[in-house]
C-alpha cells in the first residue's frame, strides 16, 4: 500500500493537475487540500460501509462487579462485529446487543437471567446479569482508524503526515478521491464513480477469504461453546 502523497500524485495525474509537493502542510494549495479532504472522506465512507479485514480488531477486557464495564469499549471503536462476543471464563456466548426494551425488562424482572447479555449505550458497555469481577469477555470490532503512520506504530483517525499509509486498496482510494473531486468541481464524474463501485464490489468478494457453506445450513467448524438453552416451546406427548 502507498502513502497518501504517492496516491495524491497518481490522482493529480488522472485529473490533469499539477502534482502536489505535499498535502497536510500545504494549507494554501486548494488542489492539495481538496485531494486530502476527498481521500479522507473516501476512507471514512469505506469503513462505514463494510467490515474490511484490514480494520477488524479484537478487544478483550476483564469484568468488574457492576453492570457498566469500564473497559468494555476500546479506543477507536466504531462498531461491533455481530455474534462475536464470548465469555472466555465461562466458555459461553454473550448474547446481544439486546434491545433497549429487553434491557429494561431484565432490570424490572424479579428473576435473574442465567446467561450473559449486553447492551451498548452512551458509548459504554453494560452486562446483565451483573457479573462477578475477574471474568474475561472478548469480541471483534471495526476500528475508526483509517491509516497508520510511516513507522507502522501509530494509527490515525485522520491524516497528519504525508508519509502515512491508508488501510484501504490504493486503486480504490484513487478512484474514490477522483470522483469526489470531480463532483465538487462540478464536472462529470459518473464513469469514475461506476468504476469505483465495481472495484469496491470486487474487493469485497475477495476480502478476508470466504468459508465453505454446507447445503444443510450447518458448518464443519461448529465447535462454538454455546450454552444449553431451554426450548421456547415445550412439547408434551
Feature map (PLM): residue ranges:
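Glycine-enriched, solvent-exposed interface loops adjoining structured elements
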Residues: 1-237
Amino acid at each position: 500500500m502507498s502513502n497518501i502523497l504517492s496516491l495524491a500524485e497518481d490522482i493529480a495525474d488522472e485529473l490533469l493537475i499539477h502534482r502536489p509537493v505535499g498535502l497536510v502542510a500545504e494549507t494554501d494549495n486548494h488542489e492539495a487540500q481538496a485531494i486530502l479532504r476527498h481521500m479522507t472522506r473516501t476512507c471514512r465512507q469505506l469503513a462505514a460501509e463494510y467490515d474490511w479485514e484490514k480494520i477488524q480488531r479484537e478487544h478483550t477486557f476483564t469484568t468488574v462487579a457492576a453492570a457498566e464495564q469500564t473497559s468494555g469499549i476500546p479506543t477507536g471503536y466504531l462498531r461491533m462485529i455481530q455474534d462475536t462476543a464470548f465469555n472466555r471464563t465461562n466458555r459461553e456466548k454473550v448474547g446481544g446487543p439486546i434491545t433497549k426494551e429487553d434491557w429494561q425488562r431484565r432490570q424490572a424482572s424479579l428473576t435473574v437471567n442465567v446467561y450473559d447479555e449486553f447492551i451498548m449505550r452512551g458509548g459504554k458497555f453494560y452486562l446483565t446479569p451483573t457479573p462477578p469481577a475477574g471474568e474475561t469477555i472478548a469480541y471483534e470490532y471495526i476500528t475508526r482508524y483509517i491509516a497508520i503512520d510511516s513507522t507502522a506504530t501509530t494509527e490515525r483517525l485522520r491524516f497528519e503526515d504525508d508519509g502515512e499509509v491508508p488501510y484501504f486498496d490504493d486503486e480504490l482510494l484513487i478512484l474514490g478521491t477522483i470522483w469526489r473531486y470531480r463532483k465538487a468541481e462540478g464536472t462529470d464524474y459518473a464513469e469514475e464513480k461506476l468504476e469505483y463501485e465495481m472495484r469496491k464490489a470486487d474487493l469485497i468478494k475477495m476480502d478476508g477469504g470466504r468459508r465453505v457453506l454446507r447445503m444443510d445450513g450447518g458448518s464443519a467448524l461448529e465447535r462454538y461453546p454455546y450454552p444449553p438453552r431451554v426450548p421456547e416451546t415445550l412439547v408434551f406427548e
